[in-house]
Regions:
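Active-site PLP attachment segment
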Residues: 96-134
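Glycine/threonine-rich helix-loop capping motifs at alpha-helix boundaries
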Residues: 139-148
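Structural signature of PLP-dependent enzymes
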Residues: 133-140, 159-182
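Substrate-binding/gating loop at the entrance of the active-site cleft, primarily
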Residues: 1-10
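Generic structural signal for small/hydrophobic residues in well-ordered secondary structure
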Residues: 3-4, 42, 49, 77, ...
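Conserved glycine-rich beta-strand-loop-beta hairpin in the small C-terminal domain of fold type I
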Residues: 156, 172-182, 193-207
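Helix-loop "lid/cap" segments that line or gate small-molecule binding pockets
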Residues: 119-127, 152-161
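Active-site phosphate-binding strand-loop segment of PLP-dependent enzymes
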Residues: 15-89
Length: 207
């Protein structure tokens, strides 16, 4: 992986299921590993890939309090944030506190939502001036995956009112598809557990 090739070590903190079968962050494990491994940057996936959890505000706040305590920079992968199933709401990581706003690089793209993968149309939001300048400096040294004219127009077009109208219809269809798929798997696939996602269009199966 590119991170490891650049001398970084990846430390995982697996999710755990609560008494209701809902996947949660293991805050005790997160803090232990941050402290013991001297972690200074964290990748925060919201909504979560692959289990499809759409984090509640208190969960994001608690994670960001840990990152603040140990001065950890946060890369918030929010590429699935448009695809929230009915009954749930995405909370942007940068919105939960002023500190979260300033220590987080939030990453987005229309590729998952509007089927534009491959056009290289991702973008990030950075409020912290110092952090933004560092990212711009490093990215200016390479043209790898730079946006092009086609991807720029595709991104602008996706986020027009017509795109949002289409997305509202898509979310209704996906919600119905998820309901059907989860019921079918539970009824026909003995020994396989399925976690009903709150966002994304993926199903997380425990085989």
């Amino acid at each position: 992986m590119s991170l490891e090739n650049n001398g970084y070590h990846i430390v995982h903190s697996p999710l755990v299921k609560d008494e209701n079968g809902v996947w949660r962050m293991n805050f005790e494990d997160m803090e232990k590993k941050i402290a013991e491994k001297h972690i200074h940057a964290a990748v925060f996936c919201s909504p979560h890939n692959p289990c499809g959890r759409v984090w509640e505000r208190w969960e994001i706040e608690k994670a960001m309090e840990l990152y603040k305590k140990y001065d950890v920079f946060v890369i918030s992968d929010e590429i699935w944030s448009d695809l929230i199933l009915e009954g749930h709401k995405h909370i942007p990581t940068q919105s939960v506190s002023e500190d979260a706003r300033n220590r987080t690089v939030a990453m987005y793209a229309p590729s998952k939502t509007f089927n534009l993968a491959g056009l290289v149309g991702s973008y990030h939001i950075i409020y912290n001036t110092w952090l933004r300048e560092r990212v711009l400096k490093e990215s200016s040294l390479s043209h790898y995956n730079a946006m092009n004219v086609l991807s720029m127009h595709a991104l602008v077009g996706a986020y027009k009112p017509e795109g949002y109208e289409w997305l509202d219809e898509l979310r209704q269809v996906l919600t119905g598809n998820v309901e059907f798929a989860c019921r079918y798997i539970q009824d026909h696939f003995e020994g396989i557990e399925v976690s009903k996602p709150e966002g994304t269009y993926m199903l997380f199966l425990d085989c």
